[in-house]
Amino acid sequence: MIIDRVQVEAINSFSNLELLKEVYGLIWILPILTLLLGITIEVLVIVWLEREISASIQQRIGPEYAGPLGLLQAIADGTKLLFKEDILPSRGDIPLFSIGPSIAVISILLSFLVIPLGYRFVLADLSIGVFLWIAISSIAPIGLLMAGYSSNNKYSFLGGLRAAAQSISYEIPLTFCVLAISLLSNSLSTVDIVEAQSKYGFFGWNLWRQPIGFLVFLISSLAECERLPFDLPEAEEELVAGYQTEYSGIKYGLFYLVSYLNLLVSSLFVTVLYLGGWNLSIPYISFFGFFQMNKMVGILEMTMSIFITLTKAYLFLFISITIRWTLPRMRMDQLLNLGWKFLLPISLGNLLLTTSFQLVSL
């Protein structure tokens, strides 16, 4: 069989095209891998900070043997859970039991798609960014309910029911607060919301324009994270460990990861929606604006904006960790009353007030 020169060139061009597609695929996945690496490091830092802050509040030393200042303690705990035996309940629903933790983790990780960590540093700048986050985060309680139901354990099932009830109770006030912010910014895009706060610097933050909404969003975020005083789905004194009771090994580690990922996502959204995101508090002044724009200056500006965003997020993290180790747990009826009888009317009134001001200003 004789192949002429034209056919050989066609075959070579086709192979080159396939190679370019593979290279493009690798380049496209690099930002996702970078984000996953950053998320992993952030979770390890949050775990270390919580242990140090809780030790300081309780006048203890905290972790000190695993690495300098106990920095490697979280890695040691994760490695231990990785090699633990994965025990399955004999009378449980094994497929649902295995899928539950994965659904919770994936739903939280997808929320990072629309979070602008810095200037021009967001995976997906969508026109419905904040609503996509609310929709995705609503899937996580389904995984927790599946975990509780499939364990065939009364404590686990009650914990799953509590998680679902708590999520529904506080998702609605949180959504109303996000709607009020969207009205002020005339957009549902997270990037547009941050840029709308940059005009007047520190005084342009939505924290000052929406103080009531900020407080409601703060409380609702803590409840969504199931942190003390809102950790009723896994109350040790009542439910052993709630929906996590029958889990061990890596699956238990996934639930541990979900709680800190949820806390990180909530902190970043507090920063994006109310604290100006990556913007500094000085209006109209950018240090890098004095230099001619090039690649190096662009990288420095992006790095600086990521640093500013994370610094603001750590403020909320510090508040939530301090609250966890200082306030007692609420009862279930108190938690539901707070969500339905107080936060829901307040958030609805705040939304109506914001809508009225926007209509008057037209």
Swiss-Prot record:
Repeat as UniProt keyword: no
Gene: ndhA
EC number: 7.1.1.-
Molecular function via GO: NADH dehydrogenase activity; oxidoreductase activity, acting on NAD(P)H, quinone or similar compound as acceptor; quinone binding
Keywords: Chloroplast, Membrane, NAD, NADP, Plastid, Plastoquinone, Quinone, Thylakoid, Translocase, Transmembrane, Transmembrane helix
Function as written in the Swiss-Prot or TrEMBL entry: NDH shuttles electrons from NAD(P)H:plastoquinone, via FMN and iron-sulfur (Fe-S) centers, to quinones in the photosynthetic chain and possibly in a chloroplast respiratory chain. The immediate electron acceptor for the enzyme in this species is believed to be plastoquinone. Couples the redox reaction to proton translocation, and thus conserves the redox energy in a proton gradient.
Subcellular location: Plastid, Chloroplast thylakoid membrane
Self-association and partners: NDH is composed of at least 16 different subunits, 5 of which are encoded in the nucleus.
Main location: plastid
Assigned GO CC terms: chloroplast thylakoid membrane; plastid
Membrane-spanning residues: 27-47, 94-114, 128-148, 164-184, 202-222, 247-267, 303-323, 335-355
Chloroplast listed as a keyword: yes
Cited Pfam families: NADHdh
Entry protein name: NAD(P)H-quinone oxidoreductase subunit 1, chloroplastic
InterPro entries: NADH_UbQ_OxRdtase_su1/FPO, NADH_UbQ_OxRdtase_su1_CS
GO process terms (BP): aerobic respiration; photosynthesis, light reaction
Family: Belongs to the complex I subunit 1 family.
